[in-house]
Amino acid sequence: LLTEATPPKKTLGGETMQTLAVQPSLVQRVCDAIVTAIVEGRLPSGGRLIQDEIARTLGVSRQPVQQALLLLRNQGLVKEASGRGLIVAPLEPKAVRDLFELRGAMEALAVRLACERPQALRQADAWLQRGRAALRDGAIEDQIAADIEFHSELALASGNDLLAGTMAPHWPKFRRIMAEVLRAGEQASRRIWDEHEAILAAVRAGDADRAETLTRQHLAKAAKLVEGRLDAEVEATMNENALA
């Protein structure tokens, strides 16, 4: 259960009022819990999001759930569905492609800049080790967390604060997308960590061209894999409907 603190009362215009905001940390924890449920498939694509059920499951009031769902809607993970309220937004091939194109451009610049300050990559090896350990354990969510931390460290090592800040809002979407990549099988997962290691070696060698090329290839392969899985799901659904 997530613990919820009672918001303090404040005065406005001489009158005591209950503050509207709940603890930001609680809202973020509710967000994280919902995203994790989406990533793990417990909240399926297109499934309804019922606030009372989520609040009851997490042991919080509806207020932080409402705020969390609003944030997730703004991030594109949740959407309004006519007559159904809020649902888990389906993954669309074009949206996946757009995200990977944006990420490819940003990370290509990040690794080029990081080649000038490889000493800033203090935790990269630790994230590689954690990712490989999670792979051995079959822990997809832990692999995703290590993947995000690894790529975030590359962005931070660039020394460009705008790069890291621009990428941060998109990580919840990529958690979901990465789950699709990692569910493709152990071979795909192992390849991801081998590619991470090669990118890191290129950055530490100061080889900006190779680091950029490897990064773009790494992301392009992941995008192609996810798009292929989504296209296959669409085709399967169409075939089922045709037979119905």
Could you describe each region identified by the protein language model?
Residues 99, 119-180, 193-202, 210-221:
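Conserved amphipathic alpha-helical segments that form helical-bundle/coiled-coil interaction surfaces
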Residues 1-5, 57, 183, 187-244:
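C-terminal regulatory/effector modules of DNA-binding transcriptional regulators
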Residues 74-79, 170-173, 187-190:
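Mobile beta-alpha loop/short-helix "lid" or hinge segments that flank ligand
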Residues 1-119, 227-244:
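Short linear motifs at protein or domain termini
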Residues 83, 106, 126, 191-194:
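Alpha-helix N-cap/N′ positions at the starts of helices
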Residues 92-93, 179-182:
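Short alpha-helical transmembrane interface motifs in multi-pass membrane proteins
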